[in-house]
From Swiss-Prot:
Its main location: cytoplasm. Monomer. One of its GO terms (molecular function) is alpha,alpha-trehalase activity. The gene is treF. This is Cytoplasmic trehalase. It comes from Salmonella arizonae (strain ATCC BAA-731 / CDC346-86 / RSK2980). Keywords: Cytoplasm, Glycosidase, Hydrolase. The active site is at D326 (proton donor/acceptor), E509 (proton donor/acceptor). Belongs to the glycosyl hydrolase 37 family. It is found in: Cytoplasm. Substrate binds at R168, W175, D176, N212, R221, S222, Q223, R292, D293, E294, G324, E525. The lineage of its organism: Bacteria, Pseudomonadati, Pseudomonadota, Gammaproteobacteria, Enterobacterales.
Length: 549
């Protein structure tokens, strides 16, 4: 595999002058206002109330004290702690005692907060179990119940049971859940599928979108919009009829397209960019421009090394988290430096393919319900998006989709995200055939397909392979008649996961698949996680299609 390096660029190229939200952000949450008037909680009968305050907003200088001193090795630990009493009383106590000579921050936190539990860590796998048996027995371990919610915690209560990925992740995640659902369906767990369907619909109804995850600190962003794919899965498996979700799909679409009507050429607002020819495409975005609660110290340190206004860096870090690819060379100006992140300046191929699927789903379900005007409107929207993607994101010279840098008006890097248009049926057969050749030569390994061909130390780059990318590549190529490539990726991935399982008796978040024996994937802001929701889901589905490896 060719080893590629990316060259840094001068800071003169990186100015932002047309993004409506960089100078003034009407959606920015004001901390002083939030302290004076907390949002009304969303009530679920029989459960403690949730509210929208993040731990950073709620605990203010106490939060910064804990995070800046690295009291816990993982920055996510304190945001996930639950208070033992009214948070305002905790903050008042902290302000009274913090300057005392004998003040002990660790003891104070331990006396006033419940530390998060990692229930799945107590599970011991049976080495005699097959891979299929292991996954089926993990579903109850990864299931959380509504009554698990603790008052004033950052966890957002949900009305039904849900699946968490495992490891440090004790909440459900939006796009992870779709790939987890594939395995639940294969395992015959329609009960959990129904619960998760109800939960995601409930979040759209109450928050206007599906958050990154069910934590207050995730409310300001979403993740790749895969609810339309979930609805399709519910329909196919007889769990829930697609018609009941039409309004939810429209609400999600409104979230992603907010502000589109008022944009002039070459302007952006939140998730939407008006291209030079007047077409509309989308980018990842977060309504906040502060350090992430769950990675506070890491974000502060990254911003220090950027040479840019910290709020711009924080926004791009948050938008990178919204992409699900946190982090990757896809979002970096200089592939060796996370501080060069520019997520909001890229038009991602995967996001726009998922939105094409959303537009198509709204059109199709509207047709089923006899809503002809809505059907025609959204068929046109889908057609317009496909045309814009082909114009800006299809690299005809090299035969692949690429992200587009709308600031510089040039194509960005090639990655495994390019297979999403095939998965949602947006490509034509010539594009699919040409893309297959590129994937074979640049991403395919004996262990599966890599996220990218660039070695940066980030987790969504070479040498790592991820379950959702394998699934979309397998099904995408098979949809266009390339069964040989789809089957090869499937067998390679099953071999990778099974080899690791036979040695360690667990499934993990990502795998090192570039050369040699498959092993744990590296990179990222946190240690490798096991469990693992979407790996379990994809592998379980593949076992149903191909049998045990």
């Amino acid at each position: 595999m060719l080893h590629q390096k990316l060259n840094p660029t001068s800071s003169e190229d990186l100015t932002i002058d047309v993004d409506l939200l960089y100078e003034t952000d009407p959606c920015e949450l004001k901390l002083d206002e939030m302290i004076e008037a907390e949002p009304e909680p969303e009530m679920i009968e029989g459960l403690p109330a949730s509210d929208a305050l993040t731990p950073a907003d709620r605990y203010l200088e106490l939060f910064e004290h804990v995070q800046s001193t690295k009291l816990f090795p993982d920055s996510k630990t304190f945001p996930d702690c639950a208070p033992k009493m009214d948070p305002l009383d905790i903050l008042i106590r902290y302000r009274k005692v913090r300057r005392h000579r004998d003040f002990d921050l660790r003891r104070f936190v331990e006396n006033h907060f419940w530390l998060p539990e990692t229930l799945s860590s107590e599970y011991v796998s049976n080495p005699e179990n097959s891979l299929k048996e292991h996954i089926d027995q993990l579903w109850p371990i990864l299931t959380r119940e509504p009554q698990d919610h603790i008052p004033w915690s950052s966890l957002l209560a949900l009305p039904q049971s849900y699946i968490v990925p495992g490891g440090r992740f004790s909440e459900t995640y939006y796009w992870d859940s779709y790939f987890t659902m594939l395995g639940l369906a294969e395992s015959g767990r329609e009960d959990l599928l129904k619960c998760m369907a109800d939960n995601f619909a409930w979040m759209i109804e109450n928050y206007g979108h599906i958050p990154n995850g069910n934590r207050t600190y995730y409310l300001s962003r979403s993740q790749p919009p895969v609810f339309a794919l979930m609805v399709e899965l519910f329909e196919e498996d007889g769990v829930r009829g697609a018609r009941r979700y039409l309004d939810h799909l429209k609400m999600e679409y409104a979230f992603w397209m907010d502000g589109a009507e008022s944009l002039a050429l070459n302007q952006a607002y939140r998730h939407v960019v008006r291209m030079p020819d007047g077409s509309l495409l989308n980018r990842y975005w977060d309504d906040r421009d502060t350090p992430r609660d769950e990675s506070w110290l890491e974000d502060v340190e990254t911003a220090k090394h950027s040479g840019r206004p910290p709020n711009e860096v924080y926004r791009d870090l948050r938008a990178g988290a919204a992409s699900g690819w946190d982090y990757s060379s896809r979002w970096l100006r200089d592939a060796g430096r996370l501080a060069s992140i520019r997520t909001t300046q890229f038009i991602p191929i995967d996001l726009n393919a998922f939105l094409y699927k959303l537009e198509s789903a709204i059109a199709n379900i509207s047709a089923l319900k006899g809503e002809r005007d809505t059907e025609a409107l959204f068929r046109q929207k889908a057609s317009d998006r496909r045309a814009a993607v082909n114009h800006y994101l299809w690299d005809d010279e090299n035969g692949c989709y690429r992200d587009y840098d709308w600031r510089r008006e040039e194509m960005a890097l090639f990655s495994a995200a390019s297979i999403v248009p095939l998965y949602v049926g947006m490509a034509n057969h010539e594009q699919a055939d040409r893309l297959a050749n590129v994937v074979r030569s640049r991403l395919l390994t004996p262990g599966g397909i890599m996220a990218t061909e660039y070695e940066t130390g980030e987790q969504w780059d070479k040498p790592n392979g991820w379950a959702p990318l394998q699934w979309m590549a397998i099904q995408g190529f098979k949809l266009y008649g390339d069964d040989m490539l789809g089957d090869e990726i499937a067998h390679n991935w099953l071999k990778t996961v099974n080899h690791f399982y036979q040695e360690h008796h667990k499934l993990i978040e990502k795998y090192h698949i570039s050369g040699g024996t498959p092993r744990e994937g590296g990179g990222g802001e946190y240690p490798l996680q096991d469990g693992f929701g979407w790996t379990n889901g994809v592998v379980r589905r593949l076992i149903g299609l191909y049998g045990e490896p």
